[in-house]
Amino acid sequence: MSGSVLIAAGGTGGHISPGVALAEVLAEKLSSFGFDAVYLHSLVRNKDNPDLLNPPCEVIWHNVPQLGGLRTIFYPLLFIYPFLKTIFLFNRLKVKAVIGMGGYSSLPSILYAILFRKQLYLCEQNCVPGKITRIFAKFSKKIAFSFPLAEGYAINGKTIGNPVRRRVVPEHLNIRQNENLHEGKKNTVNVLVLGGSQGARQLNQMILKTMENSEISSKYKFRLLTGTSLYEETKSKSLGDAEIISYANDMKPNYEWANIVVARSGAGVLAECLVFGLPMILIPYPYAADNHQKENANYIESQGAGVTIHSTSDDPTRLVQILLGWKDHSEILREMGHVSLALSNVNAAYQTVSYFFTEHN
C-alpha cells in the first residue's frame, strides 16, 4: 500500500498519548507496513501537550466545532468548512488509511475515510466503547481494544492493550518497586497520587485528610501530582511531609519511585501503572462519559491489580482503611504487583499496528 497513514489523535491526553505511541512505531517502520508517510491529526489547542512537543512525525493541526448548546443545532453548518479543508488537505497528503483514536475531534478524519473509501481503523481505550467507536464500528476494517469490553457491549475486534509511549516504558520490566517491602528492608511505602493534568481536588483533599492519621503518616510517604490549577491550593493546606508537585512532563521517575498509585481510572494511567507492575487504588471520575472510568476500575479490581473507591466526596475513611490493611502485609502489594505486570502489554503499540496492517482476518 503506497500513500500515507493518518492517526486522528485529537481530544484529550487519553486519545493523544496512545496515538503518538502508534506514530512512533509507524515512523520507524513505514516501509514494512506499506506506507510512504505517517501524520498525526490533532486539535490546535493541543500544541502544548507534552506528547506533541517532540512528535515522531509531522502533526497536522486543525479545529473542529465542539458539540453542546446551540452549536448542536447548527453543527452541520459549522462542520462544513473545516471538513472541506480536511478533504483537500488529505487528498494532497495522499491519505490511504486513517486510525481513529476516539473523541469528537477524530470525526473529520473518520468521515473522510468513509466517504472516500479509505481504510478505517479504530482504537478504543476504555471498557465502555465511546460514541465514535459505537457509531463507526461497522465502517471500520479492524478495531483494537485496550481492555476487554464491559458486559453488554458486543463489538468485533481484538483486545491488545493500550499503546504506551517509549519514553514511559521502564527499562527493566519487573516489580522491583515492591520486592523489598518486607520488614527490615524498607520502613516506608511510597504512594504516588495522580490527579491528571487538570488536577482532581477530591483526590488531593482525600490524601491530605488521610495523612492526618498518625499510623498512615508513619508508614507511607506521599507524592501528589496536583495539576497546575490546584497546586497552590493543595500546597497551602499540606501539613505533613508530602511532596507536592504541580505537573510532571516525564512520568517515568515518578512511577519508578512509587510502590502504590492512587488515581482516577482513565485508560492511559492504567496502562502506564500496569507496565510498571504497580498496585492501584482507583477513584473513578463519576462524571466520565458513559461512566467508563467506573468500568475501567472494575476490570482492574476484578483481575486483582487494584481496589476501587466509588465516591464523590473527599471522605478518607475507605482509603485509610485500605492503607491500614496493607500496612503490615507487604505480600499483598507484591501479589498485586505481579498481577498488574501480567496484565500489561509493553508491546501494545507495535502489536496494534501489526494487527491493523499485516494480520489477516
Question: Locations of the language-model features?
Answer:
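C-terminal alpha-helical cap of glycosyltransferases
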Residues: 345-361
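An amphipathic, basic-hydrophobic alpha-helix
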Residues: 68-97, 115
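Active-site-proximal region of nucleotide-activated glycan assembly enzymes
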Residues: 36, 114-175
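C-terminal "capping" alpha-helix adjacent to the active site of nucleotide-linked donor transferases
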Residues: 303, 308-310, 314-331
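Donor-nucleotide binding loops and adjacent catalytic segments primarily
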Residues: 27, 39-41, 45-55, 170-176, ...
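Conserved nucleotide-sugar phosphate-binding/catalytic loop shared by glycosyltransferases and other
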Residues: 5-10, 33-77, 310-312
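A short, well-ordered alpha-helix in the C-terminal region of glycosyltransferases
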Residues: 332-346
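Acidic donor-binding loop of glycosyltransferase active sites
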Residues: 95-97, 256-270, 278-279
